[in-house]
Amino acid sequence: NVSSQYISALLMIAPILSNGLTLTLTGEIISRPYINLTLQLMNDFGARAKWLNEYQLKVEPQPYQSIPFYVESDWSAASYWYQIAALSNKAEIILPGLFETSYQGDSKVAEIFQLLGIESIYGNKMVTLKKTDKIAERLDYDFINQPDLAQTFVVTCALMNIPFRFSGLQSLKIKETDRITALIKEMGKLGYILHEIDDRI
C-alpha cells in the first residue's frame, strides 16, 4: 500500500526467473491501473502475466519477445495541457499520440476535466481539447487509482475558484518529495489555504 512501482519492478523481471513469480498483495492496493498497465505491456511483448484473483498475480517463466510497438504519448503529461485549456478563456489544443482506448490509468484525466469544461474529441492517434462553458460547481474525487493527477486538479480548481475535496493521496508523500507538503507550501505563496486530513486535501 506504498507504491505500485515496487510491484511493477518485480513483475517485469519475473519472466526471466527460472520459476516465474507469484505475488500475493496485502492491504489496500493503490494505483491498480499502473499494475494493469505493466501486465498489459508485458503480455504485448510475449510474457504471460495475469491476476489470479483480486490480490494475487502470477507470471510464467517465459522470456520477452521483440516486436514492433507504437508508444502512446503520456496521459500524465497531457494533464497540464488540459489545465492550460481549463484556465484559458478560449482554447483548442491538439495533442498527438493519445488514444481514446488507452492502457494508461491516467487517461481518466479526460473524463475528470470534462467536469471542468474541457471536451475531448478523439481522432486518428490524437485528441483535441476544446473549452466549453459546462463547469461543475464543486469537484470531489478519489485519486487512489490516479494519484499523479491530483496536483494538476488541486491547482486547477484553486485557480478556477472551484471548491474541491480529493482523497486517495497517501502515495504522494513518498514520491521524489512529499508532494502534499510541497503543494500546500507553494499554493500558500499564492494565497490559497489547503487543509490536509489523513489522505485527503
What positions do the PLM features span?
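Short, structured segments at the rim of ligand-binding sites
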Residues: N1-I201
